[in-house]
A protein has these predicted regions:
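Acidic, surface-exposed loops and disordered segments
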Residues: 1-185
């Protein structure tokens, strides 16, 4: 297992997955890391939805794609899958009544991405969850799933074993990413 610092420095988004499902043990380890993410005042506003049924993931993927801007959809191949055919999909929702809800959900996603990487599992943060769950269809899904309409989407995470041919790009870090401040007005 890589050191924590190495995982944080080397993790990359994976967008090509093998068909086989991740193990229950690995999924539980990832979810444990997610549940232990910091949250404002320890209010723990996030909910993590776990979807592993291929047909449900396919339907949610098409729904997600419907929120892309038209000019992007027009530039994509017809068979483009925003969830990259991953066998596991996590949806991170948060209670909008908690002041730090988006930050809390983002920390959960960060823990998921890094825990997955430490286990050799590929992951990618997929956007448009907010748009999905702000919509009427999203509100209906929340009801179906037994959740309050107070939940909003922060993001999706796809998980799976990376395809053998998938290559990780070297991450270029901006030179001005960190600014040291040593004076005040």
């Amino acid at each position: 297992m890589e050191s924590t610092i190495d995982v944080l420095k080397n993790r990359r988004s994976v967008k090509s997955f093998k068909d086989n499902q991740i193990s229950k043990e690995d999924l539980e380890s990832i979810l444990s890391a997610a549940k232990n993410a910091p949250s404002g005042m320890n209010l723990q506003s996030p909910k993590i939805l776990v979807i592993q049924r291929k047909k449900i993931i396919e339907r949610l993927s098409q729904w997600n794609k419907s929120f892309y801007p038209k000019e992007i959809v027009d530039s994509l191949p017809d068979d483009f899958d925003p969830f990259y055919n991953a066998p596991t999909l996590l949806i991170i929702l948060v209670d909008k009544n908690v002041n730090t809800c988006v930050e809390d959900g983002s920390l959960v996603i960060g823990n998921i991405l890094n825990a997955a990487s430490s286990l050799g599992i590929g992951s990618c943060w997929i956007h448009r969850a907010r748009e999905e769950f702000d919509s009427l269809q999203g509100k209906e899904l929340l009801k179906v799933w037994g959740l309050s309409e107070d939940y909003i989407g922060v993001g999706h995470v796809v998980l799976g074993y990376p395809n053998d041919e998938f290559t990780f790009n070297k991450k270029e870090i901006k030179e001005d990413y960190v600014v040291y401040v040593d004076d005040l007005i």
